[in-house]
């Protein structure tokens, strides 16, 4: 089937006035290949050229004024090819001096008694405006050239095309295209939305702020609705082929295992286990996200599920993003299972004969549980009968990597885990097809981490506080943003310099260094020494952000903390507070921006990862929250997942109703269905 367009044009781009082969090349650099692409190339922002009352204008602000010329323009030249044009306007009985630099040609355009509109910076004291643009009115009415003066669209452009040119070309295209409605009359009426014709014309050429808001709302809903149609359709397709073998686990053995644990499960952990067990008994594959704050006990929940699979005769796999984390998981699971399960570790460091034996044991079923990095998805890793695949910190893996692991078994159940609590808005979008279990309770006996913020000049005082903890027999982390010094970031501390400084302060043998450039063996050696209390202070980059578990560590210093986002800071902070001892986190930062100050303030106010994730999303946006490529999110042109989260929920409900009821597959939705199928359904946003 040919590509289905919802916007159709009788012309190609080359047939539009003003577009030749050179312009085509520039447009293609902007990813504009067809007239449809041009019409959907929306402005990134709007210049508000609304004429302002000078009595209300703030000093040194950018304003737009309209007045009558009462002195002839005068041009003075100075320097090398520089000029200054001066003209006086009467603006509502206020005499205003207008200055235009390096625009001498305006002298021929500006006439006495002419009404003009000027945009520029206002000097209230001098009653003077430094103009950067002027619009000419013809006998008191706006010319076509100035038709967009009030709300002027601004597009992302490249060298070879000007704003006015792309505006004119879009105006041409809109006059000739046929626009098929993307939403039904029923939906538009239900949510008071506009037609797509009105919406696109208004987004490109708004006549008022009110019209622009209505158009933006309609287009945002449309984007979210199309995205959710895709998500719901994929979900339907996946479930239709998601037949699974019921996992007939031995509940008595599972209960006995839980009773033998050296601690009592929290209610949140029990609830999550029950939700997962219900999925395992269902006739379709499990797709569940288990999210919990740092230290909330997700690994124990995973362990119980793995044990259940073992009692049913199935293997389990756990894939994590780093070797350090894989080793820690393997160590903790071996301790939990004892002799009841055969746990193996597979990373890139496992080679030769050891790897060969491990793979043989995996294929013949001797290994019950395999833990590892992306090494698990290699072709020669063959399971005997894997029934459960768990991916930890799943947003750090691409969709393809996660899918390859899942395909290791014919009817494998899938559990994703994350210690980065997903904001509700992103959970709906990225994991809309999954069920979500959340652990918001910390294990009994844990004390909230005391977080404080200190300026750089207070470093010595922080060092004394850390020394006090070390004297109690505790351990500490010191985190830096850089491995080595950078000429571009001279004011940012680097981990090597701080490591050497602390070695002089505490002694060489008491301080360890960890960063991403070390080999796997070197990292293992350092972590082993820290875990065994051979090292008191670990100086590190964010390589310790996830999973590292040393209960005796009770102090964390994060240097240049304003260089990190809220979620990263919270993950780092979660490396302490993993015992019943009081833990401390000190943020050393002298932020120069409002955002940096806000992050430091928020971190000292709450230790709730779910609250922090929402604030982080608000501050950074969805693309930066996960990293654009890993988020699974499309680049919405108008919709904003933070501002439009209620709209997202409505769009999801409407899409789910259409797909699940089967109405979407009737003739009424034929055009829209073909569009989603041909343009969106199998598109990867990864």
Swiss-Prot record:
Keyword ATP-binding (UniProt): yes
Single GO biological process annotation from the record: DNA recombination
Top-level division of the source organism's lineage: Bacteria
Limits of the Helicase ATP-binding domain: 279-439
Observed effect of gene inactivation: Increased sensitivity to ciproxoflacin.
GO terms for MF: ATP binding; ATP hydrolysis activity; DNA binding; DNA helicase activity
UniProt family annotation: Belongs to the helicase family. RecG subfamily.
Biological role: Plays a critical role in recombination and DNA repair. Helps process Holliday junction intermediates to mature products by catalyzing branch migration. Has replication fork regression activity, unwinds stalled or blocked replication forks to make a HJ that can be resolved. Has a DNA unwinding activity characteristic of a DNA helicase with 3'-5' polarity.
Comment on protein domains: The wedge domain within the N-terminus inserts into the replication fork junction, where the lagging and leading strand split.
Protein name: ATP-dependent DNA helicase RecG
Organism the protein comes from: Staphylococcus aureus (strain NCTC 8325 / PS 47)
